[in-house]
């Protein structure tokens, strides 16, 4: 039996208003089949897009190892001696045809960090533009631009460090519009009782892109040379763009092949949630406490996420003393767990709402708590386990895996409170959530001058404390119903 779209119960308490969907009670429409549907085709193509997006983002971190002349790098060996050496000797690379550069550690840090300085700039403009011109073109151009710039990475490296830093910042500008644009598209495509499933499918591509691109980039460097990392991923991005522009539409109403029943199902399920206002209510948005609950949660979650994304390979190498080949696999393993968790949680969250009548806010709170407190606990445990390599890797993997719960929590709450402005809201929250990527690793490095286990325990404890604070703040102040300022006067008065 397919779920029916039920009407509101008629009372005004929070639990009732949170238990979407919002259709007039006089009309009940069965959910359109998922198989081969336009909305799930959109989710799968978006999945591929975010797969490519994250492959384009993280490939430099692997290629940089081959780009730098290790004999000339002006850095000391910071490998800790607290844990015993246990890795097998590293196999010598087959290929050394790629050009080498004499960049010290500080220069490499600027190259890797320059992406975020572009990424943070286009978050809010991206959300605003998506609400005006639609997310399809904006998301497509964002990934296309990043792919094209990626193709020019070898040329920029030859021109010098400044050129490469500028190029990476431009890639960040392109990627900055993508998540707000996707959120804006889902505001027109995702029925309330399918939001968790559809959004987690699409955004899970980012995790799998990280999992695949990290070891694949290493393989490409090993058997070919580092330039092909950028050429191959860049070309894949261009192919994806062509498919995206050919298949996808901004709304169900403009889709060429969608069935009449599916279009009616989607449009009807959203009709009392979308605003007809032309002017963005910026003051009301910025005064909204539920929005700031998402901001705090997003910032807190990303502090841990970016700390691990950028420093986990360092911890694996310098503290746990895994070799380069083991490091690539073990650093990708946690993100594979997170990818699986995101897919399962998307199904589970909507199942709780449909079958068990959980309210929207209850689901968002539960999944956010598990997805933020759980990682905090296991991150601290990983720090205090010392040199037990197996347990340390297991705890770090569990920590990142549990973070996948948050994908059905605060991560999609923008669509619950203001579907018409979801792209703008995500732009706002992701602007704040990008800051940890810029300062978190710097703070972590400053806290580990001697690279001891005790210093890393401090890094992990700070990240865990920030995560727990964000989870508590979101639980206290988040909402699950569409806010009054996000509705037109017509809908706001219930007519």
Curated annotation (Swiss-Prot):
It is a multi-pass membrane protein. Residues 1-41, 131-136, 187-197, 248-290, 355-365, 413-423, 479-495 are cytoplasmic. A motif (Dileucine internalization motif) lies at residues 22-23. One of its GO terms (molecular function) is symporter activity. PROSITE patterns: MFS. One of its GO terms (biological process) is sialic acid transport. Changing residue 334 to R: Abolishes H(+)-coupled sialic acid transporter activity. CDD domains: MFS_SLC17A5. It catalyses: N-acetylneuraminate(in) + H(+)(in) = N-acetylneuraminate(out) + H(+)(out); D-glucuronate(out) + H(+)(out) = D-glucuronate(in) + H(+)(in); 2 nitrate(out) + H(+)(out) = 2 nitrate(in) + H(+)(in); L-aspartate(out) = L-aspartate(in). Changing residue 371 to V: Remains in the endoplasmic reticulum. Keywords: Cell membrane, Cytoplasmic vesicle, Glycoprotein, Lysosome, Membrane, Sugar transport, Symport, Synapse, Transmembrane, Transmembrane helix, Transport. Residues 66-109, 158-162, 221-225, 313-331, 386-390, 445-455 are lumenal. Glycans are attached at residues 71, 77, 95. Changing residue 168 to C: Abolishes H(+)-coupled sialic acid transporter activity. Changing residue 172 to C: Decreases protein levels and alters subcellular localization. Coiled coil: none annotated. Its main location: membrane. It is found in: Basolateral cell membrane; Cytoplasmic vesicle, Secretory vesicle, Synaptic vesicle membrane; Lysosome membrane. The chain crosses the membrane at residues 42-65, 110-130, 137-157, 163-186, 198-220, 226-247, 291-312, 332-354, 366-385, 391-412, 424-444, 456-478. Residues 1-22 are annotated as: Disordered. GO terms for cellular component: apical plasma membrane; basolateral plasma membrane; cytoplasmic vesicle; cytosol; glutamatergic synapse; lysosomal membrane; lysosome; plasma membrane. The keyword Lyase does not apply. Belongs to the major facilitator superfamily. PANTHER family: SIALIN (PTHR11662:SF432), SOLUTE CARRIER FAMILY 17 (PTHR11662). Multifunctional anion transporter that operates via two distinct transport mechanisms, namely proton-coupled anion cotransport and membrane potential-dependent anion transport. Electroneutral proton-coupled acidic monosaccharide symporter, with a sugar to proton stoichiometry of 1:1. Exports glucuronic acid and free sialic acid derived from sialoglycoconjugate degradation out of lysosomes, driven by outwardly directed lysosomal pH gradient. This is Sialin. It comes from Rattus norvegicus (Rat). The lineage of its organism: Eukaryota, Metazoa, Chordata, Craniata, Vertebrata.
